[in-house]
């Protein structure tokens, strides 16, 4: 049985750990709320630019952008968004499991995959795919730099435009609420047209400041970039939510462990006192009988 001193040391250690996990939980809550606000404010931009693309495309039916072109799949691109830090439960491992299953399915069909990796946690997992990794983007922080994101995916988009890649997916953790985050893989390219009653079937005539093709190309590129950026924000919000829950669980476990150690401390202390009293009584009896 552990001594009283050892138990007191354990209690102190667990109490200090509890303080750390509680602080990390509060920090994660604050960061999650801020990221959630940025994520919510970015959604209307993606929706509006998608509607603009559809309106403009209807005005130029003779021009079919490569982002709308469906091709026979010979090679795919996969953008994987993970976190830079750990202590967020099974968030990353669940995503990687889904991605690896996706890659395995394409590999069985003899379709190679080119990868773009976001986040430090993805690097060791896909180390064996080093020859297929086009770029690695890490340390994005709480406020991802849009230029850093664009530069990271640019090589993949160029390969798609010259038909060296036929389909592009992005894998990330979708944020639902602080309790629920789900790994998700969606198709980025080719784009599918919006089927909505809000989009009129009427053909529109537009006046352009410069060549219409350049404007349409720019709109398509901006839309894909906004989708990737939005996915990164979703993943960051999911990371903070998962870390908040992990730290909350750790704090609760620490509280339970402290209760157990205090109970053990009292038992050991009581046993020690009882033993000392027994020894004193035995000594006194020996003296009186001697």
Swiss-Prot record:
CDD domains: F1-ATPase_gamma. Belongs to the ATPase gamma chain family. It comes from Buchnera aphidicola subsp. Diuraphis noxia. It comes from the Bacteria. It is found in: Cell membrane. One of its GO terms (cellular component) is proton-transporting ATP synthase complex. F-type ATPases have 2 components, CF(1) - the catalytic core - and CF(0) - the membrane proton channel. CF(1) has five subunits: alpha(3), beta(3), gamma(1), delta(1), epsilon(1). CF(0) has three main subunits: a, b and c. Produces ATP from ADP in the presence of a proton gradient across the membrane. The gamma chain is believed to be important in regulating ATPase activity and the flow of protons through the CF(0) complex. This is ATP synthase gamma chain. One of its GO terms (biological process) is proton motive force-driven plasma membrane ATP synthesis. GO terms for molecular function: ATP binding; proton-transporting ATP synthase activity, rotational mechanism. It is a peripheral membrane protein. Keywords: ATP synthesis, Cell membrane, CF(1), Hydrogen ion transport, Ion transport, Membrane, Transport.
